[in-house]
Amino acid sequence: MSDLFAKLMDQIEMPLDMRRSSAFSSADIIEVKVHSVSRLWEFHFAFAAVLPIATYRELHDRLIRTFEAADIKVTFDIQAAQVDYSDDLLQAYYQEAFEHAPCNSASFKSSFSKLKVTYEDDKLIIAAPGFVNNDHFRKNHLPNLVKQFEAFGFGTLTIDMVSDQEMTEHLTKDFVSSRQALVEKAVQDNLEAQKSLEAMMPPAEEATPAPKFDYKERVAQRQAGFEKAAITPMIEIETEENRIVFEGMVFDVERKTTRTGRHIINFKMTDYTSSFALQKWAKDDEELRKFDMIAKGAWLRVQGNIETNPFTKSLTMNVQQVKEIVHHDRKDLMPEGQKRVEFHAHTNMSTMDALPTVESLIDTAAKWGHKAVAITDHANVQSFPHGYHRARKAGIKAIFGLEANIVEDKVPISYDPVDMDLHEATYVVFDVETTGLSAMNNDLIQIAASKMFKGNIVEQFDEFIDPGHPLSAFTTELTGITDKHLQDAKPLVTVLKAFQDFCKDSILVAHNASFDVGFMNANYERHDLPKITQPVIDTLEFARNLYPEYKRHGLGPLTKRFQVSLDHHHMANYDAEATGRLLFIFLKDAREKHGIKNLLQLNTDLVAEDSYKKARIKHATIYVQNQVGLKNMFKLVSLSNIKYFEGVPRIPRTVLDAHREGLLLGTACSDGEVFDAVLTKGIDAAVDLAKYYDFIEIMPPAIYQPLVVRELIKDQAGIEQVIRDLIEVGKRANKPVLATGNVHYLEPEEEIYREIIVRSLGQGAMINRTIGRGEGAQPAPLPKAHFRTTNEMLDEFAFLGKDLAYQVVVENTQDFADRIEEVEVVKGDLYTPYIDKAEETVAELTYQKAFEIYGNPLPDIIDLRIEKELTSILGNGFAVIYLASQMLVNRSNERGYLVGSRGSVGSSFVATMIGITEVNPMPPHYVCPSCQHSEFITDGSVGSGYDLPNKPCPKCGTPYQKDGQDIPFETFLGFDGDKVPDIDLNFSGDDQPSAHLDVRDIFGDEYAFRAGTVGTVAEKTAYGFVKGYERDYGKFYRDAEVDRLAAGAAGVKRTTGQHPGGIVVIPNYMDVYDFTPVQYPADDVTASWQTTHFNFHDIDENVLKLDILGHDDPTMIRKLQDLSGIDPITIPADDPGVMALFSGTEVLGVTPEQIGTPTGMLGIPEFGTNFVRGMVNETHPTTFAELLQLSGLSHGTDVWLGNAQDLIKEGIATLKTVIGCRDDIMVYLMHAGLEPKMAFTIMERVRKGLWLKISEEERNGYIDAMRENNVPDWYIESCGKIKYMFPKAHAAAYVLMALRVAYFKVHHPIMYYCAYFSIRAKAFELKTMSGGLDAVKARMEDITIKRKNNEATNVENDLFTTLEIVNEMLERGFKFGKLDLYKSDAIEFQIKGDTLIPPFIALEGLGENVGKQIVKARQEGEFLSKMELRKRGGASSTLVEKMDEMGILGNMPEDNQLSLFDDFF
C-alpha cells in the first residue's frame, strides 16, 4: 500500500481489517483530477485484484460520505492487475452496477437488475427475456454497463444478451395470471361494493330504481384523472408501458386514411428531454375533426399506452386522450421604454454556426417590445434583404451589421527595428512556458534563452518559476513540466530582473513573438519593471515571408524541414535553442536570396504585400449608420470576398479605414482585439486599441465560460473581473459599453441544434479543437448563446450592481440604437440597363417583322395586339429587356443554334415578332406567305393554328401557313402590363457559355454578374449530422428525436453558389454596390464569374435578370441538322407520321411487344417518361392542341392525378376540354362570357393554388359569375383542386421542339439514334449494347427485377432508359457496332451505313480528355502494343484491360519487343 493511499484510508476511516486484507496490500493512487469549478475530484486507484464486493461497497460509501461533508463530489475507478471472472463475483458486481449512474435509470434497472449473468467464451452473458433483448437496450444501455464494469476493475468486458425462452414464457405467464388476478379482484370488489350498497338501501317498498350507468360521469372521471396525472419525461420511457402522460410540442404531423375510411394521425412530439412518435385513430371524418388541435407547433397533453410499432419497430404511444395546453413563451418583463437592444445576433446566414432565420429573430425582438435589433452575421450580409422587409412589417428598427474578420495589412517581422547590421548583431533567442494563454490570468513557469552571435551560442539562460499552485494536468501534458521541476524555482521577480540583465544590448527573437513579448511585458508591468523596448524579430513571420510556399510554419514543421534538433517541444530551453538555429538559417537565406543585411530591411523589403493572408484574424462588429454606410458596407463585403479572401473573407485595416464613413464599429466577442488585449496585455494596451472603436462590447459570463475550460480564465470570478476590466477600458477610452448577447439561437433548448451543426465541421474547425490530448479529449463546450430578454441580461450582469448593469444593458444599447438611421436596403423600383434607342429599335423590329408576315396595313387584330403590348413594354421601361433578349437569341442563331423559350414569354406577340420566341400567341390563323392575306379563328373552336386543315390562299392560291396558340398577353406582364418581364431562354448547352459572354459584351464586365444563390443544410444532410454526432459523442437518440434534431439543424447556410443560367445586369448609370455586394461562388477565387452576394430572388424586382439556361433540345436539333442538312424551321408541326407516334408503333415498323410500349414515345422530349407515356396511352392525342394539354397536365400539380384523369376516365370531359395550361382558363372563361379582368383573376388564383385559400365571399363571387355564364360544375370543382399550372407558351415551345426531334425518329431514324446517344443518353454499357438483341433484352429484364425489389442503382436506372432506345433501334433493323480503336470518335457517335459506332467516352471510366488523346495519338501512327496505347493514348491499365476483354484491341501484344520466333515466322 502506498503512503498516499494509506493517508487517504486514514482520512475516510476505512476499517482496519479491510485495510490489512490482501486486497489492499499493493493499493495505490494512480492519479487525482481536481475540477475546481465543479468541485469534482476523480480518483484513479490501482489494486492487485478486483476487490471483494463488500470491500468495494465500504470503500465507495466512506469515500463519498467523507468528501460530501466538504461539499466535494467524488468519483473513482479501479485498475486491477488480476481479474476474477467467477460467476458469484460477476453477479454481485452486476447488481452493484445498477446503483451507479448511468446504469440506474428506472426502466433499465427494473428490467435488468434481477437477471442472472455468466461468463462464457470471454463474454459476460446476460440471460434476458425476449421482450427486453432488443436493439434499444443494446444500443442505449449495454455500453454504460461496459463502462461501469471497467470502473469496477474488470477492464474492457464484452457484454452480450441472450434470450431465455423459459424465462420469457414464465414471465409472460406470470403477467397474464397477474392481470387475470387483478381482473378477478376488481370483479370481487365490485360485488362486495354492490352488497354494501344493497345493505344500505331502504326497504323494498321505498326503493327507487337502480341508477343507470352514467357514461358522461365516467368520461368526466377519466378526464379528471387525465388532468391530474403525473407527467412523464419522454427520455425516461424505454420499454412498453401503460397509461403514460406526456406534455410537449408537436413538430411533425401526417394524416392518412385507410381503405375502410378510418383515419390515422401519425405525429411526433418533443418535451425537449427527448421526442416520441405517437398515433391517434379516428373512426370517421366527424371524429377526425375533434383532433384538429394535433397540428405542427401545437402544445399538447396526451395519454396513452407505449407499444412497439410493428412497422417502424420503435416505441410509439397509442393516444387515448389528448388536450391542447397553453405553453408560456419567455417574455421580456421590463416595462415599456426600459428594454434592451440586442447588438450582436447571428442568423442562419452565419455559415454553419447559427440557427434563427432573420424573420424569427426580428419577430422575437418585436414580440418582446424591443425597439430595435441588430443583425451581425459572420462576414456576410445575406440576411439583410429579408431582415429589411420583416422589420418594416413588424414595425421595428433593423440595425444592419456584420461580424467582420479584421487583419493587419502587413504583419511585421521585426518590432521596433533600428539601423543595425544583422550579421554583427547579438541575439537573445527566448521562449516562455506558461500555465495558459492569458498573461493576465495565467502564470510564467519557465523562461529560457540562448544568446547567439554569428550562429554560435555564447551564453544560455534557463529558469523555472513557481506559480504558487499545482500545475494542471493539461499544462503538464502540453509542456512536459511537472511540479517537481518547480520545487526549487526562484521567485518570479528575481527571474524577470535576471532575464532583463541577460537581454541587454541584443535583438530579442522568439517564434510567435507577439505572445512571448506580450506575456513578458504584462509581467514586467505587473511588477513595475520596464517593458521591452529593444528590437524584436518574430521567426514565425520571418518564415512565412521567406518561405511562402510552405503550408506550415510552426516550430515543429520548420525544425523537421531544416533538420534542426527539437527533442522536447514545448519546453522553453529546447524551443529557444531550436529557434536560434532556425534564425541563422533564415538570416543566411534572406541575405543570399533577397540581399537583406540590415534589420530595417526585414519589414521594408521582405514583408509580402499579401501578408494579410497569414495575419491573425480579429473580430469586429461593423454597423450601418446611414445610407452612405450601407454602400460602404457592400463594398467592404465585396472586397473581403473578391480581393482579400483567404480561407475566410478578410478586411485589412486600411481598407476598413478607407470605407469607414457611415459605419460604426464594436469590439465584438472574445476574438476581438480589445478583449484579447485585456486578457493578454493589460488594460493600458486595451485602452489604446479601444480608441479605434465606437463602443465596447461585453457579453454575459455564460458566453465566456468556454475560456475557463480552455484555461484562459481561471473561474467565474475571473470572468467577472475581465468584464469589469472591459468596462474600465470603455471609461478610460471614453467609449460607451454595451452588453450584447452573441445570439446564435433563440431559445435555450435550441442549443443542441447548434451543437450538432458545429460539431459536424470536425476537428479541423478551430471551434472544435480538443482540450488536451488522447482518446478522451473533447472540444470546449459551446457557450449558452440564446436570445436573452432584458431581465435575463440584467440577471447575468447583476454582479456589477443594479445601476451599472442597467446602464450597460439598457441605457447604452438604447442610446446607441438611436444613433443609427433607417436605411433602404432593397430598392423599391426596377432599374433596367440602358441601351441606346432601345424603345425605337423594339418598335421598329416588331412592325418590320409584322409587315413582312401579315402585310401593311396590318390586320386589325394584329395591329391592336402590337399597340397594346408596345404601350405596356415601352411605357414601363421594359424595352431594354426585350432588346437584350433579342440580341442574345440572334447571336446564338447566327452561331447556328435554335433557342427555345421557357415560361410565358411566348405570350408576348412582340417577343415573337422580334425573334425572342417561336411561339405565336395570336388566335389560330392562316396567313399567306406570298400576299400576306390572313384568316383568324377567334371563337375558341380551334386550340392551335397547327391543327387547322391545310388549304390554299383564296387570293393567290399559295398554300397557307398556319400558326397561333391563342395565349393572352396578360399571362406574361399581368393584366395591367406592368409586371417585370421574366424572360427565360433555353440555349444549347454547347452554346450557353458563349451566350453568357455575350451579356458581358453587350453590357460590360463590371455590370454583368452571375445570379448568386445560398445553399443551406438540407434535412437529409442534417439527419446525417445528427447520426454523426451520436457516433462521435456517444449519444443515443430514438428515431423521433433524430427527426426533431435534424429538422432543427436544417436550414443553416452551408455554402454559396450560382444560378445555372441567371445573369444579373446592373444599369450602367449605377454600380453594383447600389444593389448588392459581390463575391465568388462557393468562395472559389478562381471562378471566371463573380456572383451577387444576395440571393438573386432578393433583388429580382430591382435589376434585370436574364435566364440563359443550357438545354439538350437545341443541341439535339443542331446535331440533327448537321447530320441531315435539314433546316429544323421547315419541319411541319402537323406531320402525319409524327402524330402517328402518339397512337401506336406501326409508323416505326415494330410492334408494341417488340419495344415494350404501345406507342412510339421512347426518347421523345416531353413525352418519353413513364408518367407521360402512361398519359398518352390513356388519352390518345391526335392534335397539337391536345399535346399542349398533355404538356400542361404533366407539369402541373394536382392537375392530372385526382383531377383531369378522373374526369376523362368517367367520360365527364375530354382531353380537349379539361383544364391543361394556366392560360386556357382565362381564354375559356372569356369565350364563356366573363369579363377579361375577372377571367384573369380567376386564372391567377387557380394557377397559384389559392382557390381554396381566398375568402369564401370572394370565391363564391367567382363561382356565381361562372355559373351565370354556363361554366359546368366539374370545371369549377377542377379549379379548386389545382396547386400549380404550367404556362401554355412554355408548353408550346417544348412541344414544338419535341415534334422536330420526333420527325427525325420517324423519317431519318439512324440520324435520330446517333443524336440521341451522343447528347441525351446518360449511361452506357457497351458490352451489352453491342451484344445484340438478346443481350440487351436480358439486361433490361435483369434491371426490371432489381427495380421491383428496389435494388437497382441510379446508374442502372439511367442505363435502362438507354437500353430501351437501343432495343428499339435494333428492332427497327439498325445495328449497334463495337468500339473501334481507329474509327470511333472521342465523344460523338458515328454513322456507318445502318450501324452506329460508339465513341470512346461511351466506355465506362474513359473520360473526354483520354478519348481525345487516343484520337490524336492514332493520327500519329498505329498503336503497336498495349504499352504504347497506355503511353501515347493516355489510357490507364484498367481501361486497356477492359478494351482487350471486349475484343477492341484484337491480338495487340503487351509491348513492342519482338520475340525470337518473330524472326522466323
Curated annotation (Swiss-Prot):
Domain Exonuclease stretches: 427-583
Enzyme class (EC, first level): transferase
GO annotation, cellular component aspect: cytoplasm
Organism expressing this protein natively: Streptococcus pyogenes serotype M2 (strain MGAS10270)
SUPFAM superfamilies per the UniProt record, alphabetical: Nucleic acid-binding proteins, PHP domain-like, Ribonuclease H-like
Enzyme Commission (EC) number: 2.7.7.7
UniProt function note: Required for replicative DNA synthesis. This DNA polymerase also exhibits 3' to 5' exonuclease activity.
Top-level lineage group: Bacteria
Subcellular location per the Swiss-Prot or TrEMBL entry: Cytoplasm
Listed GO biological process terms: DNA-templated DNA replication
Sequence similarity: Belongs to the DNA polymerase type-C family. PolC subfamily.
One Pfam family named in its UniProt record: DNA_pol3_a_NII
Matching HAMAP family: DNApol_PolC
Protein name (Swiss-Prot/TrEMBL): DNA polymerase III PolC-type
GO molecular function, one term: DNA binding
Catalytic activity: DNA(n) + a 2'-deoxyribonucleoside 5'-triphosphate = DNA(n+1) + diphosphate
Gene giving rise to this polypeptide: polC
Listed NCBIfam families: dnaq, polC_Gram_pos, PRK00448.1
Sorted UniProt keywords: Cytoplasm, DNA replication, DNA-directed DNA polymerase, Exonuclease, Hydrolase, Nuclease, Nucleotidyltransferase, Transferase
